[in-house]
Amino acid sequence: MKICILTIATNKYIQFVEKLYEDISEKFCPGAEINCLLFTDHEIEEIGDKVKVHYIDHEPWPMPTLKRYNYFVKERDFILEHDYCFYFDADMRIDNVVKSEEVCGDLVATRHGYQSLHDKSQQSFDRNPKSLAYVPFDQETVTYYAGGFNGGKTENFIEMAEVIADRVDKDLTNNVVALWHDESHMNRYLIDNPPTL
């Protein structure tokens, strides 16, 4: 099984990458062939033969997170060389071994810990009807998902990435930024296309 790990490390977040990749190498899906795709605005030296670096322009917040799916779409062909791909926030840590059977689903998302404490009507879906991330108050929702870890089969992930990138671009054309940036767009997508894991 081939897995592609996606990470964005701009500004100070570059300091977390080495430890994240160490954790992934030691504890994530043992036995799988893992390649990492790092999106960064830093000029960095080679960090291993299993890491591909994709340089991105330095942009002010929130662009690096808002446009993450746009970055992923640009590396579509590389990602599709793998069976699964997963996005990790650069400052994540893996404390225990994560087996492939625990995480390899068609489309994978992580419930947001803080948002899950609230009644569904108080979870912070984007309620702005001008945004393509819009979720009406009366729409049935199940879970609010965190943007820091998600993935799945590459075909499913790329399909999600293409839809989100297109919606982000259309919002930006209309001078709209979703409430929680890419996470708001991801939640809109996952309401219509629920994760399997």
Descriptions of predicted regions:
Residues 139-197:
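Catalytic core and acceptor-binding pocket of nucleotide-sugar-dependent glycosyltransferases
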Residues 33-41, 85-86, 91, 107-109, ...:
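Short, hydrophobic beta-strand segments that form beta-sheet elements in well-ordered domains
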Residues 65-75, 125-138:
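Short acidic (Asp/Glu) patches
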Residues 1-67, 74-81:
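N-terminal anchoring/stem segment of glycosyltransferases
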Residues 69-119:
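GT-A fold catalytic core of metal-dependent nucleotide-sugar glycosyltransferases
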